[in-house]
């Protein structure tokens, strides 16, 4: 009986574990999810301050650097109207892949004095049948 109760409690507790939500884009080859969106600098190759606001769909790069080999620094697969917000001086260094690759509508938006430098051995920005808008950069 005791084992039976333990099994029931274990099964019920696993039912309450929520699955992580994916937001439809990747940073440095890693899905941005409900588990990691507040601090994307935990991803290997990402430094500075990088975070995502799911309510406004804004990915903020704040004096950030993304350095990767073999994957895109930012890959927007299905996040419609993603805004890449630039604060301060930002750098993307990518080898063997496109720096920013968009499959959905994306806006790269800066404020006064913000910059984004893309260094790449292939192409800096690749957009596949989707609008890309660059504002105040």
Role assignments for model-derived ranges:
Residues 1-20:
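Bacterial Sec-dependent N-terminal signal peptides
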Residues 20-137:
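A composition-driven surface/loop motif
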């Amino acid at each position: 009986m005791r084992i039976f109760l333990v099994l029931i409690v274990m099964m019920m507790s696993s039912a309450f574990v929520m699955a992580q939500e994916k937001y439809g884009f990747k940073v440095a080859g890693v899905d941005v999810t409900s588990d990691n969106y507040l601090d994307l600098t935990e991803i290997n190759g990402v430094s500075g301050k990088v975070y995502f606001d799911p309510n406004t769909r804004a990915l903020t790069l704040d004096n950030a650097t993304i350095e990767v080999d073999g994957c895109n620094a930012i890959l927007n697969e299905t996040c419609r109207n993603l805004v890449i917000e630039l604060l301060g001086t930002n750098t993307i260094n990518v080898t063997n892949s496109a720096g920013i690759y968009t499959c959905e509508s994306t806006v790269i938006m800066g404020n006064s004095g913000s910059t984004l430098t893309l260094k790449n051995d292939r192409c800096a920005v690749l957009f596949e049948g989707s609008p890309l808008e660059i504002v105040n950069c």
